[in-house]
Amino acid sequence: MARLDHNPGRETAGMLTGPLCLDRRGFVLASLASLAASPAMGARGPIRVLIVDGVSNHDWRLTTRLLLKILESTGLFAVSISTSPPKADAPGWDQWRPDFESCDVVLQTYNDIWGGPAWPERVKSAFETFVARGGGVFFLHSANNAFADWPAYNEMIGLGWREKDFGRAIYIDDDERQAVIPAGVGEGTDHGPRYDALVRRIGEHPVHEGLPRAWMTADVELYRYARGPACQLEVLSYAREPQTRMNWPMEWTVMYGRGRCYVANYGHVWDGDKDPVTLRSVDVQTILIRALQWLARREVTWPVPEDYPTAETVSIRPALP
């Protein structure tokens, strides 16, 4: 767990807690984290993954196809998809009810930024209940752009694509301590061109057990100044961003009630991308599978492959068939 040190703008590496970490009812979220050791849902058989898609400023159709191929190739997952209507005035919203309770983990790629439709209130409520009771959620790349006006969602992602006054940002200092940038200081969330980044992991999280301390990831779009409540948040890895020359989180986890949330910067698939490198990267595929195991409260058993990237070289697999 993190502790505040003598500099109020810094916190030690670990989970961010403290007086600012209150939910909208005024209760400290840390009190809920103690409930996290609840029994696993669907502890036997394949891990049930529900991909939620249908709207995004990214290519969600290609993203879903590639995710399906990666997950189905492992034999570990039973994957279903819930696709929303495409626009706010499209038919079908009254009937759209993702069956969160039938899955172990939601793989969330939906993104309403740029005026896309928000989820109906009944879907939001069902999602909140699913996570608070112990469900897992994997927020892939632009999923943390979504739902800026939804308080519970902001708590789940911890940090998202937000204006600079929205909340605090987190960076990693040169001693690998999590440091806080207050709301209104610095910039709103942004990114530079995609690049091959040196990722450094922090600590010994189960998702990263057995991985090298550092490796190259290919063609990543790293967010700088991601902002939010950042409560019950633990940064798992980071990379140096060329423009700011600062270390920004690459992956992080958040506890929401009994639920586990995992947020990833990688996975950018833009309209017009063909065989996007990021989802062919060995590190991204490996961590995706291992994170889903952890989110489902299973033992993380997926092995570290021999072709895992090194600190000097990316590792890219052939285009998925």
What are the functions of these language-model segments?
Residues 140-239, 243, 304-321:
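An acidic, glycine-rich "communication" segment
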Residues 54-57, 141, 194-195, 269-282:
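Active-site rim elements
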Residues 40-42:
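Boundary at the C-terminal end of the N-terminal hydrophobic targeting segment
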Residues 45-47, 62, 73, 242-250, ...:
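Extracellular ligand-binding/catalytic regions of CAZymes and related secreted enzymes
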Residues 11-34:
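N-terminal secretory signal peptides and thylakoid transit peptides that target proteins
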Residues 22, 48-51, 56, 60-147:
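Helical hinge/lid and interdomain linker segments adjacent to catalytic or ligand-binding clefts
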Residues 56-57, 112-113, 144-146, 213, ...:
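Short, solvent-exposed loop/turn segments at secondary-structure junctions
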